[in-house]
């Protein structure tokens, strides 16, 4: 991952959307900004999505991130809530793609494990680790803290795949098939040696 990369992490929602911007230079992560886009719950879902698109676009254009990361959609027993969250994620992906920003997605457990060391961490544990890692003076709002954690996850994990791709001449615009071919080639070169165990006789 190049020096001075700026990552925008987003925790989608139809009432509150958290966002966090983190910069990386070498191995050092630096807090840039964070916030929460609060939407009027009394408005229709369509109206909220329009408002979300406008405010998120302003955030993206102001901070001009190099990369972005979004929490992936997880299965929810409440089908209606899951559908609304899917609408919000669609708007988020649209805004990022329209600005030409590469998008990575991470499962909630992956984010928790990367930041707090366990996939079972609660939101406060994640927030405390975010505050410590970024040297913040206070705990950010929960949604913003989650977004910062998402950005940090990509800065810590996303660089490896990109470095492998660049080493093989595969850029950020490569297709999923090309990326898969690169990984398969690398794995083929790193197959473990076969060890033969001989039994002692007598």
Over which residues does each language-model region extend?
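Phosphate- and other anionic-substrate recognition elements at nucleic-acid/protein interfaces
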Residues: 1-202
């Amino acid at each position: 991952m190049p020096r001075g990369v700026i990552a925008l992490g987003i925790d989608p929602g139809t009432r509150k959307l958290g966002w966090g911007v983190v910069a990386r230079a070498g191995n050092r992560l630096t807090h840039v900004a964070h916030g929460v886009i609060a939407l009027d719950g009394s408005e229709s879902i369509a109206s909220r999505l329009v408002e979300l698109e406008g405010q998120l676009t302003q955030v993206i254009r102001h901070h001009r991130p190099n990369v972005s990361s979004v929490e992936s959609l997880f299965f929810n027993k409440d089908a209606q809530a899951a559908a609304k969250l899917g609408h919000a994620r669609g708007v988020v992906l649209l805004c990022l793609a329209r600005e030409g920003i590469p998008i990575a997605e991470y499962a909630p457990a992956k984010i928790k494990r990367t930041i707090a060391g366990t996939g079972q961490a609660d939101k406060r544990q994640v927030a405390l680790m975010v505050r410590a890692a970024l040297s913040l003076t206070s705990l950010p709002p929960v949604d913003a803290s989650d977004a910062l954690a998402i950005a940090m996850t990509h800065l810590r994990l996303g660089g490896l795949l990109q470095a492998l791709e660049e080493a093989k001449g595969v850029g950020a615009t490569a297709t999923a098939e090309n990326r898969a071919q690169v990984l398969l080639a690398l794995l083929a070169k790193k197959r473990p040696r076969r060890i033969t165990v001989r039994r002692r006789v007598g």
